[in-house]
Amino acid sequence: MSNYNSVTPEFIDELKTLLDEKYVKTDADTLDRYKTDEEADERCFHLPDVVVIPANSEEIAGVVKLCNKYLVPLTVRGGGTGIVDGAIADKGGVVLLMERLNKIIELNKEGLYMVAQAGVRTLDIQAAAKAENLLYAGDPSSSDSCQIGGNLATNAGGIKAVRYGVTRNQVYAVQIVTPYGDIVDLGSPLKKCSTGYCMEQLVIGSEGTLGIITQVTLKLQPLPPYKIDMLAIFHDPMAAIGVVPQLVKAGIDPTSIEYMDNPNVRTTSEYLEFPGAPHIEDGIYVIITIETFNEDELDMKMEQASDICEAAGAVDVLEADERIWSMRRNCLESVSLISKVCTTDDVVVPVDEMSDMIQYIIKTVAKYPFPLRINAHIGDGNLHIVLCKLDLSDEEWESELSRFTEEVYTYAYAHGGRLSGEHGIGSKKAHFLERFTPSGELELMRKIKKAWDPNNILNPGKVFNL
């Protein structure tokens, strides 16, 4: 671990020679605003010493070089929507905001790609593509507030991953500022490339520890003109999970297959003031999206999907409107009705292990003093396990949560799973990554980090500790 220096007046003065003074913030209100991301547990909060808001890659490079000169840690922050403490300045130092890098530079309709700065909201990326009858397939639930650079940094997933893959599958190229302060372009808008190491893919998912993503080149594709959102309602969670392989084997190729257990259904309907949600008392929701380029194909696949769900035990199959999707997107926010502090895990397992994994979680949590909610991207094996602190003491919450998480991760790894499908590791899961990752793999990751960032300046304490 590096021995960092404190932020000094001299350091602040040099920052103000790199950036306009108004974009170098040391006032108490600003520092307090950026002491956390979506983390609600105040014990995890940490004040930065200074917040900077650069305008371009060159200014970012200057800040990085200065941090190396003074041995001051630097944490990059996008939209602040993460829930694993990845944008919290655990070591103090600098928090660097990407919000001024907010331009879409190019949308190439012939080449089917878009070039954008890293601070553009994901929703604006999607809208720009849609305006040209094109699709950017990345679609995390926080798309209205997260930034595209943060999506790359965590390799974000979302509701369309079952068909289109995760963020790394949507990226041709990135521009980064390295831990040395160099500006480097990695990748190119090519359909295939066998030319040296695939460095852009190494940066994607590295959570700001190997470089600061400043610009992205994203893959686009034709937008399917025909679409249906279906809501299949079950009473048995195993029956609900069981439709996934059948939908895939039938060749339906759904865009989304989303799962909400009944506690989520009840809490989100209350949170959104939607008392008329279907089967609110006992329904388990599976939301299925089908998109096609042909209306007859859509009708055929919709009928197939409905038949599969009914044969699997669905008590109702309906068309899902935006209120149902709003319920799905607000699963995390809605638990604020019952607990100020909660934690969301996003363990991922092979799709054929989903049913057993959920059964194991339901059985295991019965030993613990907190309520459970599960929502999931069941089409790609990614579960969101939401646990609420309620009135537990800090000590009891920490102890019981640690024991439960250890049990769940042990089971997941024994069945081919991993700690995170899309949220990343941050500092919250770093000790678990060190505990469960095979020693050879962990050592290789540490060697890469040390080679790229010998002073451990960028986002220290995230992913793993040095």
Q: What function would you assign to each model-found segment?
A:
Residues T26-T36, I233, I241-E407, Y411, ...:
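C-terminal substrate-recognition/cap domain of FAD-linked oxidoreductases
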Residues M1-K65, G82-L112, N264-P275, A320-T343, ...:
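N-terminal flexible segment immediately upstream of the FAD-binding catalytic core
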Residues C67, G208, D453:
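Conserved, mostly hydrophobic/aromatic
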Residues K103-E258, L458:
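FAD-binding subdomain of flavoenzyme oxidoreductases
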Residues D182, A430-L466:
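Activity-critical C-terminal alpha-helical subdomain
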Residues D20-E21, Y413-I425, P454-L458:
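Alpha-helix capping/hinge segments and adjacent helical runs
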Residues L15, C67, G119, G181, ...:
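Residue-level signal for inorganic ion chemistry
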